[in-house]
Every structure is written in structure tokens, then in C-alpha cells.
Amino acid sequence: GTSGLRRLSSAELGASLRALFGVEASDLLVDVPEAGSTRVPFDNDFTAQAVSTSLVQALSTFADAYAARVVADARRPVEALAGCRPSGPGDRACFEAVVRAVGRRLLRRALAVDEVTRYAGLLSYAAEEQRFDSAVELLIAALVQHPEHLYRLETGAPSAADPGLLELDQASIATRLALLVTGVLPDTRLLEAAEAGRLADPSVRRAEAARLWATPEARAHWARFHAMWLGYQGLELPPTLSAELSRETQQLYDRVLFHEDRRWLDIFALDESYLSPALAAHYGLPAPAAAAWVPARGGGVLSHGTFLVQGAKFGDTSPTLRGARLFERVLCGHLGPPPVDVDTDNPPPGGPSACKTERYAMRQIPACAGCHIVTDDLGFGLENLGVTGQWRDAEAGRPACTIDGRGRALAQIFTGPRELGQVLSRAPEVERCATRQLFRYVVGRPEAPADQATLDALAAQLATTPRFREVVLALAASPALVHRVR
């Protein structure tokens, strides 16, 4: 399918700069407008990216602020990158080394002689201010907002086998590979492989992907993917609770995807949770002496507060919202808007003592039944878990309204998060949806009819080898990574 001109997302930009210089950037990126897609849950949909005056100004402001932060860092990361220490403000040889080193990493190619000469002209500012770092700061600011840094400019030659395809050049392959596995731009070792022309070899790409898989950047990258996929990116909770919940879920992904290389969909089925004493107390579970993996309620992330809090409405849980999130994100179902005469801004009708099973009766309305039979059957199965995951046997404030935790998913009756997770983690429908969401994230756009063969191949790959790491490494070695539609 189509490969468009993709701009780095704020997360990719910040993570790439942090990996290169060791200097944090995320707090400076908060004012950079992010593309908001209504068709996929991810922040890298290039079909929603647009250039505006406000974006250009925000990126310029960011580049200036970040460059100042880098040169102020006592560790002198730029000098370490260039391998030289300036003898004075006019040290041209050292500054040209800085230009070549920083330019190569940010633009993913060697700078031409005339480019190095042009950027070396910035030394006049260093001489004027008697400060070598004045030129370095201007250089970093210029390169950070350079189009070749901010955009994935994929170039190549027409394919001899298929004139409709381009065979990507080595630098473009390196960029694709690095962003696929880690969400950051290529490191020095990957650029060296590209410069040696070795990335056309699938076995080399797979080996490089396996190396990158072991980095902290890869773990953070795929945690972000899952957070956006399942909808809990940016929790609006008290900071301490948010940190505890986020750590629990991060530990789940680290264990399933990285440490134990388990089945990908075990994220919905793991029976243990990583709990601190404080989080165990919050959930109403026996507290370990220190943070540890302990038996919990099952269902993997389905019983985590990170996921559950999304289903809060009207001061309590909403079976409809929870079920809708599962149906749309985990089963890739589509829900249309409610009828225009339905009031969604007020709680479902019913007396003060009415139980939810009575009040959530929209399935009895013909115009609403099609959606609510699906969403409410899913959501009621998680009702034993409160807004942020506390166990309860009855509805809040209604002790007579006991909760049995029964629900229905994919025509199967289940009780509670453990049984729901067992259903979802083994369902072909979830395998297909998971690979669809992965495709959307990797290619940076919604799927199109022309992508069906690729989607089928991804789903078949997961069905055959259900480990997430293997799916990613297979993508890295695949012909699709080194080609694009002309």
C-alpha cells in the first residue's frame, strides 16, 4: 500500500534526541502540535499530519530550547559524539568534526563537503561571542528542524522485478528498521551497516533488529504502542497512583514481550501482577513485603487500573464504555454514533436503588440494541472491578446490587477478567485485530483494501509463531521493509 511522507511524531522525535545526546526533550515538546487521527488510535498517522504556521513556529522554538539545553549539559555530549575538545572558540577542525558527527546522526547520511563548509560558517558567531558553544548551539538548532531530520524522506531506485515499486536506499532502510524496532532514529552501528551496503540482506536486517530489540528504547516504544492501542496513554489520575498503575502495566509488557518472550496475547491472560505494597492495598489484594510478581485476578492488562479507568462515567464504571473499548480496540469492531435523540450526557434512567442491570437497558431499544448487546455483554463481565481496579462484590452505594461478573464475548459466556482474558487471548478474531493495529502503527496510516494480503500474512505469522518479538523480527527481514510504492 501507500507509503506517504511521514513526519516523526513528538514521541519519536524526543526519544531519538534523548538516545543521541542523553538529554531529555519530552518536556520541551508539549507545545508542538501533534497530529490527531480520528481513524486510528495512534499518534503517527501521516494522513492526519499537516504543516501549519503554528507547527513551524513551535518546532523552531523547540529546536532553539533543546539546543541550548544540550550545550549546557555538563557531560558535553556533543564533544563526546564528535571525538574532539575545542582548543578555543575558533577551532574549525573540531567544529567541522561536530558538524559531520551530528549531521550524520540527525540526517541519517554523511554530509557533503559543501554542506560542512556552509555549517562551518557558524563559527563566526563563536568568534564574535568568544564561545565555541555558540556555534554548536546554532548548529544543533538548525539540524533539529531540518526537513531531513523531521521527515522520513524515503528514496531509492525503481525495482527491476516490479516497476511499481522503489527499492529503498540503505539510509532509508536503516531509518525504517530503527523506527520499527525502537521508535528512534538509527544508531551509529546501524548507520555503519547501511554505509557498508549490508541492509539489503534479510539476515543482516534480522540480526540488527534482534540487537535493537534488547535496548531500553525498544521496550519504551512497544509500551507506547500498547498504551495507545488499548487507549490509556496519558492517565488523568493522581501522580502517585498513575505511576503505580503505569509501572504495573509496563512490567507486564516487559515480562511477556521481552523477558520471557511469551505469546503476545498473554498480555490478556497473565494471572500474576507486579504489585507494590501500596498498589496491592489499593486493589484490595494481599500486600507483598516489597514490589513483586504475585497472584492476582488474572486477565493480564484487563484487570489493571490503566485499562479499567477508561470506562469511568457518572462517578462510577460504565459497562458500555468498557465494552466499547474492548470491541473497538481488541476486536476491531465498529460502533456508529448513537441515535440523535439519545441523551449520553446524563446517567441512564432509573430510581436511586435501581441496579445497573436495570438501568443499562438500552439493548431493549431497537435503535440501540445492535451496539449495546455487544458492548454491555463485554463490559458487565468486568463490573467486579471498580473505576481503578478495586474489587467489589456489589455496586458502589448499592449493597443490594450484587455483581456476578458474568458477560459474553465472541458467543462465549465468561465470568470476570480471568475468563475474559482466556477467551480473548486464544481468539483468532483478536489475533487478526492485534496484527491490524500493529500494521496501522508500523506503516503510520489506516489500512486500505490493497493491504489485505499484508494483513493476512501478518495474522498468519502470529498464528504460526505467536510471539510478538518474532512478528517484529519477521517484519524487519521482510521484502516489504525495503520497498515502497512509487
Regions found by a protein language model. Name each.
Residues 15, 19, 228, 364-373, ...:
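C-type cytochrome heme c attachment motif
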Residues 86-139, 160:
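A conserved hydrophobic secondary-structure block that centers on an alpha-helix together
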Residues 280, 294-431, 442, 449, ...:
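Sequence context surrounding c-type heme c attachment/ligation sites in exported
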